[in-house]
């Protein structure tokens, strides 16, 4: 095990940065450390099996999300369950950054981080984005804020369309 000081992001990550602080979103996304199926800090036995949820490493999870966003899997929904402070917001912000602009320098850095964790998954992810050549609409919602869910989703969709100079009428 080797500590990567160059990947250290000092502080909590806020998913809201995806919409309101591009610089922090970039820094946090570029610092995310993926782990692949060969290295996992815990085992399925550690988290149990009675709940029916399968333990998945972050590189494989990222690949599943990307495949679902581009319609390569039938099940469009997935869920991340983990304890407080385990990096769910950091991972979500990183994936939103990657999917929202897959051809950016930041996304290249994210894909390189996936390749560092698992070269095969990283290569497959890179090829997926080359073939798709279009971004996905990532709606990032901070569940700690009080809002009407339907209104917030609508607001974010309209905001994303306006940002790309698309008509919202």
Description of each model-found segment:
Residues 1-86, 92-93, 138:
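Walker A/P-loop-proximal flanking segment of P-loop NTPase domains
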Residues 74-77, 81-169:
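P-loop NTPase nucleotide-binding core
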